[in-house]
C-alpha cells in the first residue's frame, strides 16, 4: 500500500467537515456523559443499564447496517441496480443464515465467534473515520492499519472482561442460554489469564500509539486518536458492560458508519457542501427503515424458534444481541468490500 493517499469518499473539505464534526463529537460527548455515573459511584437500575441497547433497535444501531443494500453499490459503482440488491441479499441469506444455524447447533462457540467478529468489525469501523475524517498520515500500510483495528476493536470487546469479568461471563452465558448452551469455567475468566491479557493489551495499545506518534507529521490528528483510545479504555474499564456496549454501539460505532453511508450517497453531496446534515440524515432514515423493520421481524421469528424463549429483560436483550450477531457477519462482509473499494484495506 505504501504511503499513497487513501481513495475514500469524493467529498469537498466543507462537505467532509459537515459530516465529520457531528459524527465524531456525538461519540465523544455521549461516552463522557455515560461514564459519569460509574465515576461518581452512582449505580444504575437494570432498566437504565439496558436502555441504550434497547434503543439501538431503532436509534442508529440496527439502522446503520440496514442501509447495506444501498451503501455497497453506491461505494462500488455509484449506482443502485437490481443486480446489486440481489448481491447484498445473497450475502445476508448465506452468511446470516449459516451463522443463525450455528447458534442452534453450537451456541457457545457461536457466542465467542460473535465476540471475535465484533472485535474485527468495531475495529474496522474506527479505522475509516481515522483515515477519512481525521486524515491521519501514519496508518499508511496494512500492518499499521491492522494493528489499529486490533486495538480499537479490543477496547469494547476485551477491556470489559478485564474490569467486569463476572458480568462479562453472564452476558456471554445469556447469549447461549436460549439455545441450551452454557459457558462454564473457561480459561479466559481465570484471574491470571485476565491479568496477562490486560498487560499484553495495554502494552500493545501504547506501542501502536507510540509508533503513530513517531511517524506522524500531523500531531493534532494523532492527539485525537490517542485521546479517543484513552477515553474508550477508561470507559470500558469502569462502566458496566451492557450499558457501556449499548452506548458505544448507538452513538459511537453506528453513528460513524451512518456518516460513511451518507458520504457514498452522491445525491446528498450538495446538501453537505451547503453545511446541511439534517437533510442527508433524514434521507438515510427513510432508506434504512424498510430493512430495519425486516430485521426486527426476523427478531420475532428468532424469539419464536429458540428452545428456551427469553422471560426477563436480561435474556431478551441477550437474544436481541444474537439477532445483531446474525446480521453482523454479512454486514462485516459488506463493510470489508467497501474497505477494499475505497482503499481502506
From Swiss-Prot:
InterPro entries in alphabetical order: Blh_diox
Documented EC number(s): 1.13.11.63
Effect of gene knockout: In-frame deletion of blh reduces bacteriorhodopsin accumulation on solid medium but not in liquid. However, deletion of both brp and blh completely abolishes bacteriorhodopsin and retinal production in liquid medium, without affecting bacterioopsin accumulation, and the level of beta-carotene is increased by 5.3-fold.
GO molecular function terms attached to this record: beta-carotene 15,15'-dioxygenase activity; carotenoid dioxygenase activity; iron ion binding
Keywords assigned: Cell membrane, Dioxygenase, Iron, Membrane, Metal-binding, Oxidoreductase, Transmembrane, Transmembrane helix
Catalytic activity: all-trans-beta-carotene + O2 = 2 all-trans-retinal
Membrane topology label: Multi-pass membrane protein
Cofactors required: Fe(2+)
Residue spans crossing the bilayer: 24-44, 52-72, 85-105, 111-131, 146-166, 171-191, 192-212, 231-251, 286-306, 318-338
Locations listed in the record: Cell membrane
GO terms for biological process, alphabetical: carotene catabolic process; retinal metabolic process
Residues binding Fe cation: 64, 121, 253, 257
Gene Ontology CC: one annotated term: plasma membrane
Similarity section: Belongs to the Brp/Blh beta-carotene diooxygenase family.
Functional summary from the UniProt entry: Appears to partially substitute for Brp function in retinal biosynthesis during bacteriorhodopsin production. Probably catalyzes the cleavage of beta-carotene at its central double bond (15,15') to yield two molecules of all-trans-retinal.
Protein name (record): Probable beta-carotene 15,15'-dioxygenase Blh
Upper classification of the organism: Archaea, Methanobacteriati, Methanobacteriota, Stenosarchaea group, Halobacteria
Amino acid at each position: 500500500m505504501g504511503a499513497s493517499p487513501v481513495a475514500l469518499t469524493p467529498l469537498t473539505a466543507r462537505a467532509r467537515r459537515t459530516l465529520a464534526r457531528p459524527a465524531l463529537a456525538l461519540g465523544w460527548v455521549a461516552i463522557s456523559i455515560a461514564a459519569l455515573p460509574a465515576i461518581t459511584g452512582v449505580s444504575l437500575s437494570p432498566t437504565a443499564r439496558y436502555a441504550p441497547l434497547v434503543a439501538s433497535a431503532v436509534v442508529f444501531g440496527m439502522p446503520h447496517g440496514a442501509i447495506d443494500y444501498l451503501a455497497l453499490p453506491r461505494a462500488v459503482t455509484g449506482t443502485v441496480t437490481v443486480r446489486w440488491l440481489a448481491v447484498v441479499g445473497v450475502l445476508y441469506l448465506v452468511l446470516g443464515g449459516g451463522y443463525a444455524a450455528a447458534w442452534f447447533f453450537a451456541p457457545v462457540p457461536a457466542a465467542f465467534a460473535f465476540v471475535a467478529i465484533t472485535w474485527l468489525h468495531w475495529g474496522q469501523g474506527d479505522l475509516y473515520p481515522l483515515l477519512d475524517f481525521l486524515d491521519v498520515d501514519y496508518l499508511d500500510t496494512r500492518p499499521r492499519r491492522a494493528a489499529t483495528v486490533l486495538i480499537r476493536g479490543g477496547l469494547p470487546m476485551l477491556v470489559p472482561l478485564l474490569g467486569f469479568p463476572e458480568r462479562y461471563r453472564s452476558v456471554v452465558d445469556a447469549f447461549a442460554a436460549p439455545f441450551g448452551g452454557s459457558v462454564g469455567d473457561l480459561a479466559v475468566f481465570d484471574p491470571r489469564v485476565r491479568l496477562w491479557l490486560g498487560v499484553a493489551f495495554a502494552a500493545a495499545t501504547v506501542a501502536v500509539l507510540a509508533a503513530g506518534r513517531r511517524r506522524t507529521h500531523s500531531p493534532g490528528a494523532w492527539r485525537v486518536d490517542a485521546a479517543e483510545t484513552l477515553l474508550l479504555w477508561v470507559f470500558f474499564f469502569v462502566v458496566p458492560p451492557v450499558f457501556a456496549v449499548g452506548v458505544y454501539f448507538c452513538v459511537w460505532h453506528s453513528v460513524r458508519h451512518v456518516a460513511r453511508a451518507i458520504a457514498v450517497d452522491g445525491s446528498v453531496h450538495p446538501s453537505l457542501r451547503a453545511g446541511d446534515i439534517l437533510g442527508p440524515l433524514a434521507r438515510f432514515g427513510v432508506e434504512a427503515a424498510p430493512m430495519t423493520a425486516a430485521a426486527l421481524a426476523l427478531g420475532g421469528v428468532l424469539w419464536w424458534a429458540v428452545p428456551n424463549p427469553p422471560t426477563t429483560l436480561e435474556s431478551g436483550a441477550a437474544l436481541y444481541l444474537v439477532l445483531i450477531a446474525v446480521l453482523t457477519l454479512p454486514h462485516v462482509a459488506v463493510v470489508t468490500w467497501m474497505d477494499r473499494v475505497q482503499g481502506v484495506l
